[in-house]
From Swiss-Prot:
It comes from Cereibacter sphaeroides (strain ATCC 17023 / DSM 158 / JCM 6121 / CCUG 31486 / LMG 2827 / NBRC 12203 / NCIMB 8253 / ATH 2.4.1.) (Rhodobacter sphaeroides). Residues 3-56 form the ClpX-type ZB domain. This is ATP-dependent Clp protease ATP-binding subunit ClpX. Component of the ClpX-ClpP complex. Forms a hexameric ring that, in the presence of ATP, binds to fourteen ClpP subunits assembled into a disk-like structure with a central cavity, resembling the structure of eukaryotic proteasomes. The keyword Nucleotidyltransferase does not apply. PANTHER family: ATP-DEPENDENT CLP PROTEASE ATP-BINDING SUBUNIT CLPX-LIKE, MITOCHONDRIAL, ATP-DEPENDENT CLP PROTEASE ATP-BINDING SUBUNIT CLPX-LIKE, MITOCHONDRIAL-RELATED. InterPro entries: AAA+_ATPase, ATP-dep_Clp_protease_ClpX, ATPase_AAA_core, Clp_ATPase_C, Clp_protease_ATP-bd_su_ClpX, ClpX_bact, P-loop_NTPase, Znf_CppX_C4. The lineage of its organism: Bacteria, Pseudomonadati, Pseudomonadota, Alphaproteobacteria, Rhodobacterales. HAMAP family: ClpX.
Length: 421
């Protein structure tokens, strides 16, 4: 409420928000029993502007276009153009479907996504970046920890609970969220033969996931844990939640290559050696019928109509990942050293050597951080206790032979050392 008393006059008016008098501001806008000054209006505008900016890209109908989505993905994920295009179109269509569902009699079905690619090629990062662009609740689940309801392990409904927690229990927002299920290749059917024992972490989990992926009203205990009769449940409709499943699918390339062997017939036919092509190249030839042979049940494959395959990251792509994205590893370590007042430099040869080590380890982009930690560990340990260090240079020898990075001292320190000697 505005204060009606002032130091110079009883009629002086004050801003109800910051308390400044009408003489201290340019304008004071009156409302029913309240006043707001021009400075507070400006502040409110800034807050609204920031909030609007943080909600990500929005086109005329509230959904970013596929090109806009792909452009933002390019800032964070290097390469994988085909996968980015597939994801951009699928996500755009999914949220366009939600925004226009009541405007027509034609019911548009949901298109969940399956990402297939080698370890460290960017599957998880793609899903995380999508959620950031769209400003929707996002959660990740590890398929290896899931079991059928009633067995030791996590129920599939715990995934929805995590999504609820990510949205601070806003059920309406949850029902437009994104769930990324990692390691989905680890819940494949253990055997083609019927077994006396129940497969609770393989086919059983696939069966349990079918319902929430297709769309059901899940009863989720608000505080987590096991369900009990006296507990109140939150009802969450999963019909409009977008599910993205990802996995390395090691061994799937052999099934694809085996299927392709029959195509080379006759004396002039070209028969390619499967080993001559990379895993990512073989994944490009994937057909939906290859997945049941790998161990996914046909009903589960049917719930994932959009399939995007990712390729192996080559040496050039790994060097780009180290230096170019917004959160590039080199930029992160340079910032750490900058806090100590030291410049960190990597030579071109050093970056190439790091990329080669990651390829040799077969860990993709995921292995880059551990390699960087190994190289810089001793330097980061000693640096806070050293005086006069101006720059740290990581060269090829530091990567390949375990030599310490070069330390460059300031001129003042050099002169002091010369005087002391």
């Amino acid at each position: 409420m505005a204060n009606n008393t002032g130091s110079d006059s009883k009629n002086t008016l004050y801003c109800s928000f910051c308390g400044k008098s009408q003489h201290e501001v340019r304008k004071l806008i009156a409302g029913p029993t309240v006043f707001i000054c021009d400075e507070c209006v400006e502040l409110c505008m800034d807050i609204i502007r920031e909030e609007t900016k943080s909600t990500g890209l929005k086109s005329a109908d509230g959904v970013p276009t596929p090109r806009e989505i792909c452009k933002v993905l390019d800032d964070y994920v290097i390469g994988q153009m085909h996968a980015k295009r597939v994801l951009s179109v699928a996500v755009h269509n999914h949220y366009k479907r939600l925004n226009h569902s009541s405007k027509t009699d034609i019911e548009l079905s949901k298109s969940n996504i399956l990402l297939i690619g080698p370890t460290g090629c960017g599957k998880t990062l793609l899903a995380q970046t999508l959620a950031r662009i769209l400003d929707v609740p996002f959660t990740m689940a590890d398929a290896t920890t899931l079991t059928e309801a009633g067995y030791v392990g996590e129920d599939v409904e715990n995934i929805i609970l995590k999504l609820l927690q990510a949205s601070e229990y806003n059920v309406e927002r949850v029902q437009r969220g994104i769930v990324y299920i990692d390691e989905v290749d680890k819940i494949t059917r253990k055997s083609d033969n019927p077994s006396i024992t129940r497969d609770v972490s393989g086919e059983g989990v696939q069966q349990a996931l079918l319902k929430i992926m297709e769309g059901t009203v899940a009863s989720v205990p608000p505080q987590g844990g096991r369900k009990h009769p006296q507990q109140e449940f939150l009802q969450v409709d999963t019909t409009n939640i977008l599910f993205i499943c990802g996995g390395a699918f090691a061994g799937l390339e052999k099934i694809i290559a085996q299927r392709g062997k029959g195509s080379g017939i006759g004396f002039g036919a070209e028969v390619k050696d499967p080993d001559a092509r990379g895993v990512g190249e073989l994944f490009k030839e994937l057909e939906p019928e290859d997945l049941p042979k790998f161990g996914l049940i046909p009903e589960f494959v049917g719930r994932l109509p959009v399939i995007a395959t990712l390729t192996d990251l080559d040496e050039a792509a790994l060097v780009t990942i180290l230096t170019e994205p917004k959160n590039a590893l080199v930029k992160q370590y340079q910032r750490l050293f900058e806090i100590e007042g030291v410049k960190l430099t990597f030579t071109a040869d050093a970056l190439t050597a790091i990329a080669k080590r990651a390829i040799k380890r077969k860990t993709g982009a995921r292995g880059l951080r551990s390699i960087m930690e190994d190289i810089l560990l001793d330097t980061m340990f000693e640096l806070p206790g050293l005086e006069g260090v101006e720059e740290v240079v990581v060269n090829e020898e530091a990567v390949n032979s375990g030599a310490k990075p070069l330390l460059i001292y300031t001129e003042v320190t050099k002169k002091k050392d010369a005087t002391a000697s």
